Amino acid sequence: RPEALARVTARAAVNAVQADCASPEAIGRVVAGADLVVGALSSSMGFATLRAVIDAGKTCVDISFMAEDAWELDAYAKERGVTAVIDCGVGPGVSNLLVGHGVAQLDVCERIEIYVGGLPALRSWPYEYKAAFAPHDVLEEYTRPARVVEHGEVVLKEALSEPELMDFPEVGTLEAFNTDGLRSLAYTMKAPFMKEKTLRYPGHIALMRALRHTGLFSKEPVTVAGGTVRPID
């Protein structure tokens, strides 16, 4: 929206451009004069945007948490002479860097476990959570199968699966569940067991499972009052 762009330019020394990021051609025009592109669009647009940036021959860093496997573009990026650093946010991102640093200190690494979660300091019913990034992408954590590594093989686990309780000083008890945050670690690390889990206040898993079970996270259109809508929207 023009008014949103105006607020950005008013508080920072940046140039704002309004463009259709669903159009690869538009993305190519926007990044044409850039030395480095940072992608921070929603996950549904991440893969196509990354492809368009590689098409433009631009080095990029992306944090969009796309559902697609970015490794599918590895050969193409090399062909275009592009360096693309994907999933470089907090988790995945900083968590991956910390794992890499830790593993480098060890002679042998048998197991990698990542626990990550951004939580409000004050719990507020019913969700006891505040989205720190795009709400639609938060919901992906409750529906997208999680890739983990068991016995050296990548396997899929259901979202919200294998809950466990963990205690943290000054925070209290939190619950953890499988999420798709290993990303590149599943291919670059040689540990036979690897997983990432997201932390929430207790009770959150049961609530999200109930919403998912009732179909509210479905992407399939349903008819309501003569119109169609996707429940997740």
For the regions a language model picked out, list residue spans one by one.
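Rossmann-fold NAD(P)-binding glycine/threonine-rich loop
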Residues: 63-87
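C-terminal catalytic/substrate-binding lobe primarily of soluble NAD(P)-dependent oxidoreductases
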Residues: 105-233
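Conserved Rossmann-fold cofactor-binding substructure of NAD(P)-dependent oxidoreductases
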Residues: 18-36, 45
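Helix N-cap at the beta1-alpha1 junction of Rossmann-like dinucleotide-binding domains, i.e.
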Residues: 1-4
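N-terminal Rossmann-like NAD(P) cofactor-binding module of classical short-chain dehydrogenase/reductase
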Residues: 31-40, 60-62
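Short, conserved SAM-binding/catalytic segment
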Residues: 7-14, 77
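Adenosine-phosphate binding glycine-rich loop
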Residues: 81-120
